[in-house]
Amino acid sequence: MGKIIGIDLGTTNSCVAIMDGTIPRVLENAEGDRTTPSIIAYTQDGETLVGQPAKRQAVTNPQNTLFAIKRLIGRRFQDEEVQRDVSIMPFKIIAADNGDAWVEVKGQKMAPPQISAEVLKKMKKTAEDYLGEPVTEAVITVPAYFNDAQRQATKDAGRIAGLEVKRIINEPTAAALAYGLDKGTGNRTIAVYDLGGGTFDISIIEIDEVDGEKTFEVLATNGDTHLGGEDFDSRLINYLVEEFKKDQGIDLRNDPLAMQRLKEAAEKAKIELSSAQQTDVNLPYITADATGPKHMNIKVTRAKLESLVEDLVNRSIEPLKVALQDAGLSVSDIDDVILVGGQTRMPMVQKKVAEFFGKEPRKDVNPDEAVAIGAAVQGGVLTGDVKDVLLLDVTPLSLGIETMGGVMTTLIAKNTTIPTKHSQVFSTAEDNQSAVTIHVLQGERKRAADNKSLGQFNLDGINPAPRGMPQIEVTFDIDADGILHVSAKDKNSGKEQKITIKASSGLNEDEIQKMVRDAEANAEADRKFEELVQTRNQGDHLLHSTRKQVEEAGDKLPADDKTAIESALTALETALKGEDKAAIEAKMQELAQVSQKLMEIAQQQHAQQQTAGADASANNAKDDDVVDAEFEEVKDKK
């Protein structure tokens, strides 16, 4: 078996590593660097440049130089975050025919996986140059909070690059593998804080060692997949643009060339301010007007940068609290804090994380390389080169289906270890229903409409039967890559239907954040809605059973009683369409009061049936002259 390489496909930079025996090794690219900018350029003469060569020519070719494509992968054009990027990116972001976010370069429409594949090809070539043999398999990392669509799109990018993606692995988990592999014996609980170029993740991971085998178990994960170094850069760029506008009266946003130079300068200044207290952004001939050329020379202090991005850093703290809560731990239970991603080099980020956990983060993990190393380790586990390592990851959000009353019924709860499979039996809501629609949802709210729809499909050919009788088995299966497969089967007819969640119906990052926040903020509203649905279902059942009893009673039910019951049934039916739980309960009570005569008739009929049954049994026993008899009680199926 050939080598399975480990690739960290980052928003800003990418990195590739392999297992050299039992030691992971980060590989240098053709330019001699251990990381490669995730930048792709299409030149005027038809050449495709990747990495540092693409970055070097960006200033002269801004519209055809693509960066931060990971922010678009597996996303819809109408997503709020994509729309924000549309206004600030120098290249053209467009809507594909299926509604996905694509880019247009020199009149050609391109999907994000196509573009990311160019970076993966360079990673593949770097590994092949080092190994001297073809490479066809890889483990690729994604943010822990990436959804089905984004994971699927990342696998597609690998396939386009000529790689069979053996496993998609979460970035914080990969970093934990890199950290934990060479550490001594003993059990540890670590927090991996991963703030990269475009995404943020926090994972709480337990490393256990039993008889020489290390188990890496993710207890909980949280994050924000639209928060990263690119956002920090944008804040500084906006500040510099406004300062220049105040000074010169010229808005640089209308000049793509100037904005590209400014982007490079802002990124450089941000990095310098991690070690220096102040820096100069000096850009001669940044633009010109009728009076001549204009130069930018603005002093930026570390304090100024921190004031510009403080709210971004604070945004990363809330997911830390949720992850700890989900893991059932407090900050004192965390033994080590690992920082991953280039943006964690910022002193303010390190300070905030240290304040939250009450301990200094470890400095012996390379934030740019740890994720690729972990991916290579996972590759080694899959080939058998790395033994005695078990990785247990989780799904970041709850998954379920819409059931009667517009409720989401959860089949797999968030932070469930994957791969996992869960089945549950549901039934029909109407008599003689021949088809059911399986509506797949992702999120934490009780009301189906408040969660993200991942897709839906129909199961047809159900045999006619009273409501509640057919048995529809719904199965959710999440594979090791975190990708969801759903099937529904009619246990009576054997008919089955399956769906794999496709890239066109994934969640976007902010929606995930919003779902969890909404679930916490709206816990009381959710509880009330759940109670309303329960009451509605009770009312619906009462409606159904009362109508059946009226039918069975026939002429035995006096006309006055029948009229009163019909009136109460209509009133209850109207109340069930509303949102008032108390009104439904009141109408149920009224129906019960006017149905007393009906209940008496029903009880009499039931007693007569039992008496008739007992008499028949006695006569049969006498006729057959049977001395010993065995009786088996047959209970009605509910």
UniProtKB/Swiss-Prot annotation:
| Extent of Low complexity compositional bias | 602-620
Which CDD domains does the annotation name?
ASKHA_NBD_HSP70_DnaK-like (cd10234)
InterPro entries cross-referenced by the UniProt entry: ATPase_NBD (IPR043129), Chaperone_DnaK (IPR012725), Heat_shock_70_CS (IPR018181), HSP70_C_sf (IPR029048), HSP70_peptide-bd_sf (IPR029047), Hsp_70_fam (IPR013126)
- Residues with PTM N6-acetyllysine: 109, 245, 304, 421, 556
Source superkingdom: Bacteria
Q: Does the keyword Acetylation apply?
A: yes
The protein's matches in HAMAP family, at most eight in alphabetical order, are given as: DnaK (MF_00332)
Tell me the protein's name: Chaperone protein DnaK
Its ancestry begins with: Bacteria, Pseudomonadati, Pseudomonadota, Gammaproteobacteria, Enterobacterales
Q: Which gene encodes it?
A: dnaK
